[in-house]
């Protein structure tokens, strides 16, 4: 059912046609391995007018004016040829190519594929391994079916089933908590929280640390408190971030952990407000513990139209003030991440509604349009059409740096070069600050056969024009090699805690939590929980062992295929990593899809369908919120203290001529931008400098350029 209420900014046109045309022209360029000249022109698949653009017009748009005649004969714009050239396009005759003075591009061949033994045995090996993997998949399916049927028919019956259905029908987080506590009480799981002993964390250390922190805080021993906090503000201190602490109840963890979290937050806030600690000591302290504790990131996987479930994940986090400031997305997840990082909180609350489906029109072309296009170009969708449609989600031609300045959130989108052996790039405000988000979004969605590789575009803010990024190289779907870029996030932003929303259908089918997952304990009988026996394995020990055995065996043979390079390079892409990546994080959400959903995997959702996807994402996020809330409560307390200590240090050290705040210093005082050296490399603030300036305003702006090893942090006061 379609609503008549208009969507927020529904009628706004964020499209810059000049940028779209420049992007479309860039797609027509090709290079040559030998002389650098342009290769034969491509067939008209991006529009008849664009296909007819001559090389001189393109060169004037995409490259600077040459200085001499030798430069005029060789354009500086370089892109790949083998991935972009249509797989079904007719080849021009050699005579015509020679007439234009162009050489045919030489095909590249992997040197390790040249041996006689490889040529002779490759296909027999691949066929045998594939048949064996299929047999293992059948056995794996039998084990999973046994576990599911045993739980459905023997465990989830009677009142327990009624309470679970009630829990699944919860529409708000508050309602979900109420229903989860009711189910915990019925299953006697609430008693588990009051028993401190548990083998997955050091409860004695947690209790002693809590008592010590409380004693130091109450006695006003601020220096000692600060030193003691440095020892416990680290990732997974004493095991308190072990997932098993949140996997034995539908809502809740050990009471000891609750008390510890509250005391740590209170102690950090006490240090922040303490007048017994110098601002410089505070700054050093918060700089150290921030680096030690790390940051949290939200990672949204690809998954075609299943990725729209991420809207519900973002909405649940936003409604509970838990949306991390670092968000990464790949393919369809990149679309959701782009929307979240280019809009403010208030704007997002108006956009994350079923009416957003009106702007999701990527798959609107009927079959009689996209089938001929696929036959001509090798891709179902048109790149320039997607560029126009994605502008609403990226707020026009916004760059990564501009999005960060607008919302304070750091957007990351993973893309893969068209060359199968080139390294992956994680585009963000550090690696590609001037790169236009929608071009990166298209590249991350360029699955072979769905969308051809595209050129990333970057903005020249002074001229308000765009030019090709990275010498015009072409890029495609990042999920082929790095769906969840955890290592890159740690490098750029010191991320060591990740919330992963995984909707890839080929991955979620193999998810199995034998010991339960966060907010979803193993379904044990009430007889066992009544006797305070809370630990059990799904389906029993034998079923769990067989499930793990078959899954590891499948992974082993997939690894063998990758190592021996047995798979053919379809569309010049390496497909061997799509099952062999790391797809999980500290918290992993696996929204379940029905078989009928696969029919609509490349279809635009209706308002009713998108509303159901949003509700599904919320339901699957609710069980994880408590775990994330505990983590972010400490992280946010550290950031509050760090922000305040920076402001205090800058004010006291660089304003010695007067006391008080800038508004009392006269109408012509203005505190200008402060540039800090790297917070973690400098041992003191001796390198920190203040650039004073005088104008008629009294507004003070403080900017820190070094939030982490290579990140930016802006604070406005």
UniProtKB/Swiss-Prot annotation:
This is Patatin-like phospholipase domain-containing protein PGUG_03164. Its EC number is 3.1.1.-. Residues 704-717 have a biased composition (Acidic residues). GO terms for molecular function: triacylglycerol lipase activity. GO terms for biological process: lipid catabolic process; triglyceride metabolic process. It comes from Meyerozyma guilliermondii (strain ATCC 6260 / CBS 566 / DSM 6381 / JCM 1539 / NBRC 10279 / NRRL Y-324). Residues 298-490 form the PNPLA domain. It is found in: Membrane.
